[in-house]
């Protein structure tokens, strides 16, 4: 079991009520709440936005994170870190802490190579995180070989309503966690079943509704007590 449960909030403003302006305001407030509660990572996953719109939202989200971090520090390892879904270009333009790559995106080691060439220095987790979405055990080991910093394995328990990819289950999660990179569990994870993910070897848990439909401070307190 992980020494400290890593927590990964994935955003989805479409779940919030109201018009677009209201949803963005609520999203940024939720991002700030997550930073205050010391969630480790936030993934800005607003896939419908254009690159320019996403960059603007990412800058606002970064401001919300930095203004809400209890330690008031610029040390990225000591505050909530913001990753952008899929768009490495937007992550770099906005000054985000990393990118979360989908299975169909450029491989993690290629992202690292481009960044190392452009910055003339080795890419470390202090500078930029590269996370990878994984849906099979093989995906996780591929992410490890391609130098991802961590993998998000999903869906473990399935999505609400039962639609989409069938749940992989805890046995598959346990097998995936044999990889040397950190693996976070996603998909139907709740406060009640998160402990079973950690017992399977996960370094932490990720979710959308887990954070957006609950008071984040309470979620963090419960999960960090596991």
Label each PLM-derived region with a short phrase.
Residues 1-71, 76-116, 126-149, 165, ...:
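Conserved N-terminal beta1-alpha1 strand-loop-helix module at the mouth
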Residues 105, 156-158:
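Short glycine-rich anion-binding loops that position phosphate/pyrophosphate groups of nucleotides
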Residues 149-156:
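Non-cysteine beta-strand/loop elements that form the S-adenosyl-L-methionine
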Residues 205:
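C-terminal binding/interaction regions
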């Amino acid at each position: 079991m992980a020494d400290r449960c890593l927590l990964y909030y994935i955003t989805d403003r479409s779940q919030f009520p109201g018009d677009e302006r209201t949803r963005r305001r609520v999203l940024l407030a939720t991002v700030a709440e997550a930073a205050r509660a010391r969630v480790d990572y936030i993934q800005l996953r607003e896939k419908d936005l254009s690159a320019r719109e996403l960059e603007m939202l990412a800058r606002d989200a970064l401001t919300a994170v930095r203004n809400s971090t209890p330690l008031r520090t610029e040390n990225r390892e000591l505050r909530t870190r913001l990753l952008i879904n899929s768009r490495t270009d937007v992550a770099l333009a906005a000054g985000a802490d990393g990118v979360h790559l989908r299975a169909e995106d450029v491989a993690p080691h290629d992202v690292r190579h481009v960044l190392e060439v452009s910055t003339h220095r080795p890419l470390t987790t202090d500078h930029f995180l590269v996370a990878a979405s994984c849906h099979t055990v093989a995906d996780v080991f591929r992410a490890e070989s391609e130098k991802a910093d961590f993998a998000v394995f999903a869906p473990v328990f399935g999505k609400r309503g039962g639609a989409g990819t069938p749940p992989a289950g805890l046995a598959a999660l346990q097998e995936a966690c044999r990889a040397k990179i950190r693996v976070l569990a996603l998909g139907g994870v709740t406060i009640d079943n998160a402990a079973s993910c950690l017992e399977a070897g996960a370094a932490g848990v990720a979710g959308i509704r887990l954070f957006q439909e609950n008071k984040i401070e309470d979620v963090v307190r419960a999960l960090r007590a596991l």
